[in-house]
Design a protein with these regions (language model features):
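PLP-dependent class I/II
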Residues: 1-166
């Protein structure tokens, strides 16, 4: 099962209760949950980000993938990490070492510098995302053939254009 919360492209998030419900299925079918949490710091809705890797009874079946490019406004700078059971990490390393070798130095230095900045603008960035969501909701609410799903986080939203016939 692959989950992206906040989601791209809708901006919707799964709640803690959603994840607890999903836990039942992970246990029932004895499968893995891949949790893409790249937008975890870009949360502005009423739902708090929740990582399923913190659920004790399935943490041995959760692969969390994340990165720094979105939270530090370094989109396009591919640098990330994963947290997973050791056996999974070993297998991923075998695969990854044949796909790419390393992250270039300037990106590593950029992320290092970003970690050193106490307040790097994330609060203001999230506030600006809320302003943009409010603006979009205002614009789309005046369009009878468009509906808008208000996001909880991330940098995306989803507009339903079905009524336009396109």
């Amino acid at each position: 099962v692959i989950v992206n919360s906040p989601n791209n492209p809708t901006g919707k998030m799964l709640s803690k209760n959603d994840f607890l419900e999903l836990t039942k299925r992970i246990e029932k079918f004895n499968c893995y949950l891949i949790s893409d949490e790249i937008y975890e710091k870009l949360v502005f809705g009423s739902i708090t980000h929740y990582s399923p890797g913190s659920i004790d009874n399935i943490k041995d079946r959760v692969i969390t993938i994340n990165g720094y490019s979105k939270a530090f406004a370094m989109t396009g700078w591919r640098i990330g990490f994963l947290a997973a059971p050791e056996i999974v990490v070993r297998k991923i390393i075998k695969l990854q070492q044949h796909i790419n070798t390393n992250t270039v130095t300037f990106i590593q230095k950029g992320v290092y510098k970003a970690f050193k900045i106490k307040e790097y603008g994330l609060t203001r960035f999230n506030e600006s995302l809320v302003e943009k969501v409010d603006y979009m909701m205002n614009v789309f609410s005046k369009q009878p053939k468009l509906s808008f799903l208000s996001p909880d986080g991330g940098i995306f939203s989803f507009v339903n254009i079905k009524s336009t016939g396109l």
